[in-house]
């Protein structure tokens, strides 16, 4: 039996989370899985997909609106398949040091993980360019600009997901 493709869907405002989704997709492909990486707002159906990884940037304590909308729109279908969630956003190294439950602004993400019976919910550091525009990004960039993503940690998380899918796809 052929495994249905894995969908990696994401909500990203400035491109950092989109790049993380691609890293996750690459790690899954390296484990011989078929993967599609798409912006969450462009996904119209989960038909033809198996496991789903859904990620979104965290802004001011909220998960990206496209990730939230995706989770609401496909909630019942997501509860019927393996699902993993991730958030990106702390603009420091706290995501590498603390459990998601101890990170500020992750409550909504964790509630969604519970509602969808996600197998895991990870939080990774984010990225904010010094020249970010708009409020509150421009104000935050003055003191917290930088790339706090940890590609090795993200790829290791994806590698663990691949092992779970290859061992027990349902």
PLM regions: where:
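FMN-binding flavodoxin-like domain, especially the glycine-rich phosphate-binding loop
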Residues: 2-5, 19, 26-27, 31, ...
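Short polar catalytic/cofactor-binding loops
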Residues: 11-15
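Short amphipathic alpha-helix with an adjacent loop that forms part of the alpha/beta core around
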Residues: 42-47
């Amino acid at each position: 039996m052929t495994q249905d493709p894995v969908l990696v869907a994401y909500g990203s405002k400035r491109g950092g989370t989109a790049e993380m989704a691609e890293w996750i997709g690459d790690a899954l492909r390296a484990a011989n899985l078929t993967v599609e990486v798409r912006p969450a707002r462009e996904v119209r159906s989960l038909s033809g997909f198996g496991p789903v990884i859904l990620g979104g940037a965290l802004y001011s304590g909220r998960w990206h609106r496209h990730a939230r909308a995706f989770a609401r729109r496909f909630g019942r279908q997501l509860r019927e398949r393996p699902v993993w969630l991730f958030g990106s956003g702390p603009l420091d190294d706290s995501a590498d040091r603390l459990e998601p439950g101890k990170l500020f602004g992750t409550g909504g993400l964790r509630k969604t993980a519970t509602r969808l019976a996600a197998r895991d919910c990870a939080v990774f550091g984010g990225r904010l360019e010094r020249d970010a525009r708009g409020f509150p990004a421009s104000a935050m960039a003055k003191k917290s600009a930088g790339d706090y993503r940890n590609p090795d940690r993200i790829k290791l998380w994806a590698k663990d997901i691949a092992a779970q899918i290859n061992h027990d796809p349902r």
